[in-house]
Regions:
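N-terminal secretory/targeting leader peptides
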Residues: 2-155, 180-412
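Short, solvent-exposed loop/beta-turn-alpha elements that line the ligand-binding surface or hinge
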Residues: 152-175, 201, 206-207
Length: 412
């Protein structure tokens, strides 16, 4: 694991920073993500120089900042969310009229405040999870009802659906001034710490009853965890790694590639695929900034978002198996295999049991207040019912990589 963290495409962090000192971090990161296979430092420098020269060959009409929370060229090769691909494609598509400075590693904003920094105009684009963004922009909670999405394919199907425009995107823009562009899709489970290293592999929700688990900022995720007797406790990120290592908490709710990219794998012993609500690392932008662009540039933003959505769909599905190791059996040399993280895939019967414990479909009362609140904010849409229906329009056995891409901003 150490080698994977300290090098990207075979180049050390120190050498990457040296190259970035000459050509800028954005050009260097774009060169890294655009490369195939391993690079020498000299090859990276040449690629970064070529990228820099291309990006600055003409004066940009608009220069925008993307606040990418903790993301960088290294971890975006683990969780394939498409943020750098979007920035590079938008620059190329507009022939340099739009230039994006990618600012990651929490240098300008973090998971909890990137959306606010976008609303305030500190950054123009941002990348963060919808769940962490919900604290500032609560309409994001529309995605977080328990078992609303049965699988990853259903998530992609919804985000490609033109109906996502009226249910998610338009109300978010109207209420919070954020234009939702594209997202990666996984489902959240429980990531058990080292306390569970020598215990039997989890096969039932009953084995998790009474455990204490770190919860993110999601308010709806907390409801689901309480109903499943998973005792959600808010723990600062800094304390989560130590809590999982020392056994102060049993686990943490998040998705598999987050464990891998955020360096949680050394302190996680079992990744329990509970699939109890959505996990989305997404890219959004200020709606004011979007509206300030002329028509062709607006079209370019949407087409680049579409390309990034398609790219993330294919690349993250491959990375879950080939990079993360979220499979059974696991491939060797994956992050989970290297760190002895066992994957606990529950049976359909066990997932149904968990769903019946906490889903609004079977246990509506704890969710009624949020459903009414979101209905009011959306202008009268029962968002849970609508998304639940759309998520089941495709066959249950559809593979995520086989979901048909659609340009969601156009009418069906």
């Amino acid at each position: 694991m150490t080698g994977r963290i300290d090098t990207i495409r075979g180049v050390s962090r120190r050498d990457i920073l040296r190259v970035a000192g000459r050509f800028g971090m954005t050009s260097t990161a774009m060169a890294l993500t655009g490369a195939a296979g391993l690079l020498s430092t000299a090859e990276l420098a040449r690629a970064a120089e070529s990228t820099y020269d291309k990006r600055f060959s003409k004066e940009a009409k608009h220069t925008f900042k993307m606040g990418a929370s903790g993301f960088n060229a290294r971890n975006l090769l683990i969780e394939r969310a498409g943020f750098l691909q979007f920035a590079r494609d938008l620059e190329e598509r507009t022939d340099g009229e739009i230039r994006i400075e990618f600012i990651g590693d929490n240098q300008i904003c973090g998971q909890l405040d990137c959306v606010e920094k976008t609303q305030l105009g500190v950054v123009d684009f941002f990348a963060a999870s919808t769940q962490n963004s919900a604290g500032v922009a609560p309409y994001y909670n529309v995605l977080d009802f328990a078992y609303m999405f049965p699988n990853r394919a259903s998530q992609y199907h919804f985000f490609y659906s033109p109906e996502s425009q009226r249910i998610l995107r338009d109300p978010l823009e109207k209420r919070h001034g954020i234009k939702f562009l594209f997202t990666h899709c996984e489902l959240r489970g429980i990531q058990l710490g080292l306390k569970w290293k020598d215990r039997d592999l989890v096969t039932s929700i009953d084995q998790l009853a009474g455990t204490k688990n770190r919860v993110t900022g999601t308010q709806l995720g907390r409801i689901a965890m309480q109903l499943m007797n998973l005792n959600p406790v808010p723990v600062a990120w800094e304390g989560t790694i130590d809590g999982l290592k020392q056994g102060l908490i049993d686990g943490a709710e998040t998705w598999a590639s987050a464990v891998a990219y955020a360096n949680m794998a050394p302190v996680v012993s079992q990744s329990v695929d509970l699939r109890f609500f959505s996990g989305n690392e997404h890219c959004g932008m200020s709606s004011k900034v979007f509206d300030s662009l002329d028509g062709p540039l607006q079209d370019a933003v949407m087409e680049s978002a579409y390309l990034a959505q398609v790219q993330s769909q294919a690349a993250n599905e491959a990375a879950l198996i080939k990079t993360v190791g979220f499979s059974d059996p696991q491939l060797p040399d994956t992050i989970f295999a290297e760190n002895n993280v066992r994957t606990a895939f529950l049976s359909d019967e066990e997932l149904k049991k968990a769903e019946e414990m906490c889903s609004p479909e079977f246990n509506p009362d704890p969710w009624s207040q949020w459903r009414e609140r979101l209905m009011q904010w959306s202008g009268g849409i029962d968002t849970y019912d609508e998304i639940y229906r759309i998520a089941r329009e495709i066959p249950a056995d559809t593979k995520p990589e086989n979901v048909e891409p659609r340009r969601w901003w156009r009418s069906a």
